[in-house]
């Protein structure tokens, strides 16, 4: 191990000497027609049509073949320039930081976990806790039966640090013998990297990974102790996900520079532990160091509600997808069923007509609008009225609508103040601001979210708003039913870590202000 670490250190030292100049080089992936890279435009169109029809909801898609982007699309209001939260796909980036720290000789796979935290380790650690190593954190074999109860939803209710909470949590199994998908274990990896480097994982990866790959201002949330969350909370753009996949596809090599030791890439993406036996499940193919093994001899990082970086070495391909889905296997099945058969070994004849069809379809992608009319006979009579609600857990005190202006507007009043949400008609209108729809406390939702809204009268007395948090997988469908002096407000999310349907609110009209 010592000899391997020394070899890694030499690689990293050479990298850091040249990194400053290299980081200035454009990292954008080249573009190509699908046919030049062995894929039919017609087959790609079939994939996009199926994704748009059957998946609710795709947010973005980038396909890279032979190092070239051959197709890319964003479902409006999502766009290429807005970062998207990755959830557990963040884990693969934390793994990369661990690999680089090992390469620099700052830690090893066999280091005891508790050795890094003498002040937060229980006075009499159990045999299994003492036996836990860095490699056990990486391969989700910590010996825990349940995840440590870290309060990511409300850190103020947790008195111990996240590290201390993990270390005092029960370890009933011998580390290395029991697979448990374990986000607090990834947080511990982040904490260890910060201990040995003096930098957060985010700052540590900036010159070593993010800048060389051309990532623009990646954002990563932290614990109350100022440690990068590690397991989740990284936000980047879809092409940046694809570049990360390309880096791993090419064993850590990028534009002629070895950013990550090839030996680490091999270890991280190989099976380090078995995690199931279902042949058709992409969650039962084995687990590496914060990477999943997948069918078709491939591997991936993935995150909640359908964030994917799929790497398919045998086809020299990377698929980057962001989405907001409940069934993540459905999206992977679509890739296996539609994209894999489309990838041929050699170039195909150009098909300009099919390519134009594909490009037009990609340019027109959008999250589906609510169906209904642009106006109602009630529009003028309810416009400007305030509907007040009894105290509720969502913190909404009152709402009002402006239907008389050219731009319909929803005004929401909470204890924090008043927010105006511009609503498009068969288009998306975007703005930033607080909007209490029950998602603010959900993991990784920005404090000042980018909100895109569109609306329609789904019936004569019901106005339906679809509200997308465009840096996340989330959208909410809000139904406002006007019934005389009453307003019945129903809301449902596409996905959530808890209930998707929120408690109904009943509002009562008061005098116009």
Model segments located where?
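Bacterial N-terminal signal peptides
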Residues: 9-20
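Active-site SXXK
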Residues: 45, 67, 84-110, 137, ...
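A short, well-structured edge-of-sheet supersecondary motif
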Residues: 48-79, 316-319
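Active-site helix/loop module of the DD-peptidase/beta-lactamase fold
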Residues: 85, 104-144, 168, 199-236
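Active-site-proximal alpha-helical segments within enzyme catalytic domains
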Residues: 185-192, 232-253, 307-324, 336
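Active-site Gly/Thr loop motif
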Residues: 217, 265-319
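Structured C-terminal helix/loop/strand segments within mature extracytoplasmic catalytic/sensor domains
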Residues: 303-370
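Peripheral terminal and inter-domain segments
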Residues: 352-513
